Amino acid sequence: MKHLWFFLLLVAAPRWVLSQVQLQESGPGLVKPSQTLSLTCTVSGGSISSGGYYWSWIRQHPGKGLEWIGYIYYSGSTYYNPSLKSLVTISVDTSKNQFSLKLSSVTAADTAVYYCAR
């Protein structure tokens, strides 16, 4: 069965930004078609529960622009890209200072670089 590759990158705040919040992604780099892609973003240097921020997932298909997947607030409120809404779940675990992405029923069209961001 053909495998799909999912690349993870570290997205961190620039050094000149006063906030030293860093986001570290983790998850498999390889998922089979029809399976669920699960990624986690761990926030360090600040609390995910600090008000005023939305925690997002974004992806970039090869040779294309960025596509916003969705975001979550620390309270659990979510908003998803309408074109992906039926396949995507974003959740937050404030006790671990993490938020996660689940993308179900992946296909070759989901091959992309996945970013977490604030």
Swiss-Prot record:
Region named Framework-3: 79-116
Location in or out of the cell: Secreted; Cell membrane
Signal peptide residues on this chain, from the entry's feature table: 1-19
Gene Ontology biological-process annotations: immunoglobulin mediated immune response
Region of interest called Complementarity-determining-2, as start-end residue ranges on this chain: 72-78
One GO location term (cellular component): extracellular region
Sorted UniProt keywords: Adaptive immunity, Cell membrane, Disulfide bond, Immunity, Immunoglobulin, Immunoglobulin domain, Membrane, Secreted, Signal
Region (Complementarity-determining-3): 117-118
Pfam family, one: V-set
Ranges of residues in domain Ig-like: 20-118
A GO term for molecular function: antigen binding
UniProt-annotated stretches for the region Framework-1: 20-44
Paired cysteines (S-S): 41-116
Region Framework-2, residue ranges: 55-71
Complementarity-determining-1: region residues: 45-54
Subunit and interaction comment: Immunoglobulins are composed of two identical heavy chains and two identical light chains; disulfide-linked.
Reported function: V region of the variable domain of immunoglobulin heavy chains that participates in the antigen recognition. Immunoglobulins, also known as antibodies, are membrane-bound or secreted glycoproteins produced by B lymphocytes. In the recognition phase of humoral immunity, the membrane-bound immunoglobulins serve as receptors which, upon binding of a specific antigen, trigger the clonal expansion and differentiation of B lymphocytes into immunoglobulins-secreting plasma cells.
Protein name as catalogued: Immunoglobulin heavy variable 4-31
Organism: Homo sapiens
